[in-house]
UniProtKB/Swiss-Prot annotation:
Its EC number is 2.7.7.6. CDD domains: RNAP_beta'_C, RNAP_beta'_N. This is DNA-directed RNA polymerase subunit beta'. It is an enzyme of class 2 (transferase). GO terms for biological process: DNA-templated transcription. It catalyses: RNA(n) + a ribonucleoside 5'-triphosphate = RNA(n+1) + diphosphate. The gene is rpoC. SUPFAM superfamilies: beta and beta-prime subunits of DNA dependent RNA-polymerase. Keywords: DNA-directed RNA polymerase, Magnesium, Metal-binding, Nucleotidyltransferase, Transcription, Transferase, Zinc. It comes from the Bacteria. The keyword Transferase applies. Zn(2+) 2 binds at residues 819, 893, 900, 903.
Amino acid sequence: MVDVNRFKSMQITLASPSKVRSWSYGEVKKPETINYRTLKPEREGLFDEVIFGPTKDWECACGKYKRIRYKGIVCDRCGVEVTRAKVRRERMGHIELKAPVSHIWYFKGIPSRMGLTLDMSPRALEEVIYFAAYVVIDPKDTPLEPKSLLTEREYREKLQEYGHGSFVAKMGAEAIQDLLKRVDLAAEIAELKEELKSASGQKRIKAVRRLDVLDAFNKSGNKPEWMVLNILPVIPPDLRPMVQLDGGRFAASDLNDLYRRVINRNNRLARLLELNAPGIIVQNEKRMLQEAVDALIDNGRRGRPITGPGSRPLKSLSHMLKGKQGRFRQNLLGKRVDFSGRSVIAVGPTLKMYQCGVPREMAIELFKPFVMREIVAKEYAGNVKAAKRMVERGDERIWDILEEVIKEHPVLLNRAPTLHRLGIQAFEPVLIDGKALRLHPLVCEAYNADFDGDQMAIHVPLSEEAQAEARLLMLAAEHILNPKDGKPVVTPSQDMVLGNYYLTMEDAGREGEGMIFKDKDEAVMAYRNGYAHLHSRVGIAVDSMPNKPWKDSQRHKIMVTTVGKILFNDIMPEDLPYLQEPNNANLTEGTPDKYFLEPGQDIQEVIDGLEINVPFKKKNLGNIIAETFKRFRTTETSAFLDRLKDLGYYHSTLAGLTVGIADIPVIDNKAEIIDAAHHRVEEINKAFRRGLMTDDDRYVAVTTTWREAKEALEKRLIETQDPKNPIVMMMDSGARGNISNFSQLAGMRGLMAAPNGRIMELPILSNFREGLSVLEMFFSTHGARKGMTDTALKTADSGYLTRRLVDVAQDVIIREDDCGTDRGLLICAITDGKEVTETLEERLQGRYTRKSVKHPETGEVLIGADQLITEDMARKIVDAGVEEVTIRSVFTCATRHGVCRHCYGINLATGDAVEVGEAVGTIAAQSIGEPGTQLTMRTFHTGGVASNTDITQGLPRIQEIFEARNPKGEAVITEVKGNVVEIEEDASTRTKKVYVQGKTGMGEYVVPFTARMKVEVGDEVNRGAALTEGSIQPKRLLEVRDTLSVETYLLAEVQKVYRSQGVEIGDKHVEVMVRQMLRKVRVMDPGDTDLLPGTLMDISDFTDANKDIVISGGIPATSRPVLMGITKASLETNSFLSAASFQETTRVLTDAAIRGKKDHLLGLKENVIIGKIIPAGTGMARYRNIEPQAMNEIEVIDHTEVSAEAVFTAEAE
């Protein structure tokens, strides 16, 4: 067997008859499967042991030879070779067809490859193949046209007219085969190339298509007549098994039925031919044979599918490959694994960041082989069998062994759906009682898990390498940052936030205010004994915390703080400043001086002079974690997170915050606000009845009135809220809930959406505290139901988007250090109208500069060319007033099949420079797809007549961008650069005309009357600028401008959608995806190259083809860039394995086979499919081809052997 990690590429071609015979171990002549009495395979049948191999290991059919010692002997009685039964999965048979049969893929596919080769319509082909018409093969001296069709009657008439043997005409696949044999590829290709020089329109398109197919046959060495089969391969029996069920009946694969039909019809045809039966009977049998083979290859592609019992269509060979249940997606890209378990999860608040709790029963089952090995090693049992019995009996001694075995052996936990790479992380197992897995509360956010019945799967990495990989790369404590934006993903939530919020509150005049303590212990003692409250402001000696980074002026003084904050700062990393205020200045620059007492100053005076600080909220904790990570990296951060979690839980328990109905305040002037709104609505309706406004205007005014009323109530709520109210604390701290929840409890519920998505005019005036009336309750249910259905639909949509994104970018890997390009991307802040969606500072962080950046006023060089921009550097550049910077970008990277380190920048998940081998394509796809579920589904209606366009937002807009579709509400763009000289309105046609005067001429653009204009007379516009509001169609922009403009536009559009929903995604992820959409060009004029016009090809391949021609002084080919949606881009990839496993499997394989395509296995997917180690991380060639250096003495002795081995390795590669 060839070693899978040894071969470099995989090719697919058409199989010639001789090739099929070379695979076969014998002809299947009978339709029998197994004998109903003996249950042994029948001779010469579909399960024959002579052809396919023995059914039992090392045993022939008759039982003369048993045992491995007879290996390789062919039994003289039954003719079966003594070998492993596994060969029944590998050995193929064949059927000699008594009449040629066309292969349905090549005849029926779109476009029909057979039709293009012969220049016949698929309709004509069908008539010939299914014996409805004759086709003229050789007219000899008659005036008949070759390839013309004749009906039965015309054929007889022509024979009488010209005499027998005066011309040749046939029907059936045989006729097609004769025609295909006559095709002279070289002559046809030359003729078509001539025709292309003058042809245009439909004629040209057809010629290009034919040329494409003929050229494919010519270059690949496939012969066109191989599209017609004379011999049919029979796949190995274990791939179409028959299994006995409990009731003595058999369940068999559908393929056996389909093969049986072919054999039956083939044998009947053979008999008819022997008997010299009448032509019409033979024809009918040949047609039935053709249909049987069609059904076997692709049942249902032509006519009605052949059905089994219960009128269920049978699954043919094509169906075995297609779809989610097909071979590719079900068995090759994802397999079920052993050493795995699944259970409900429960919270494990006492676990460390890198631990998870595994139930004892589960662990003993998962680690059984390891435990058994130890039992034998400790000599508790003599052999493995006895050890297994010990484990199964539940011997007391196995538990101690289990503890030893699982120490330092990480396990993987996964929660479905795995939307990004944080959905699988490694933990060290801790044995626990019970049956639920225990999960650390902080990793819940990454998994999107909660403990309301979620289940998780556990997997055990077995080999040493797998364990090392899990420990070094996947340990949960290492995954602090989210790969999508580089922000911490393990921020405390809910109780932890609430506990720390309560702990860091300040309050005036509580017991113990103004006490001074010598150190933390004294303060805690006073608190425990009731002398001081957590929130009291007290003094503490600075010298009791010598390791904190105090300023010199602050040492040896007394600092004002609270007992809670002393405890809070006690868990902080030593080198962080003492946190007194929840802001970044305190965190980065140190504690403000106003909290320190001058010698002899009265502490009470200082306390009275200070305002009360707000407590630390969720956002502040996130900032502290980010800062900690920036300074101390993972180990210290994960330890700190555990301390933060424990402190939060402890104090939220002590605080005992609860929610009762009395905690919901009553707004005193609610009735006034609502009456005023009613009054206003009445006025609006009056105005409408008098005809002063349209119905649309009235609707907008009414809904606005109610919205304002709700906002007024909300504002009143915020003004009157008590900071110590438990609901307010939960909301304010970011632990749970937001102002909208609070205002529904205490204010009013407000406007609801009707089932059609339109907002209803009647608001819900009650809140939940007062209770809703029946009608109001009924209105509420619309919204609730819509929410549920939207979520369900959105999840499926978002999942499919992720799948397409992963597919298109799976081969983008960091392949080299520096591609050496001299191009770059000029970036500035992304704005949407007036507001900034993404600042320049955010966009610069973690990127490399392309040119040096200078201070706009002083001209001082802030940072050189090709330098990494850190967070501090980015801030410095923006503070200097720089508005645009040219950076290295994925868009302009010159690396083939991937990106280089400098164009990519830092790896957001680690905060360090990205390493060669990082699969950045997959990470990008997950980063864009994972937040997809958070985006809305709706299309906003800008109500009223203000515009006739609906702005698509949320998930539909993202799909629109990535599929490069024509957007809804498309903007009109200008093709000339110049000034807007006139905008004239034409009332008769309900349009406006915009005139743009450029250097080369005047551009005239017609826009709809209702469109909102983006330009005014006198404005200067660039090519490709939008004249009206709306989305630009990217394909149109590509025609007017260059690739880079389109890439920049798409990047900005994607960011607008995500940022408007509060989701942050790193630019580089979007860049990777967009670059994949623009990596192809279409050849316009081939020049002196041997490219075909109209071909789609990779930019790099196109450049290569031109390079040689230019060097030899010829005319290079010209091309234009093509923007493809991600689905199309995935199918156009150079790897046929990746494309076939994505969508349209049969079409992709048909095309690849004709071209004799080679898959060079560059991406991740194709390597997973064939079971080769993926070329990412340490699987890259540059990491795998490291030869160990031998010692000197050995080198001298083994010199000859080494060189021979080196030669062999090189050949194998």
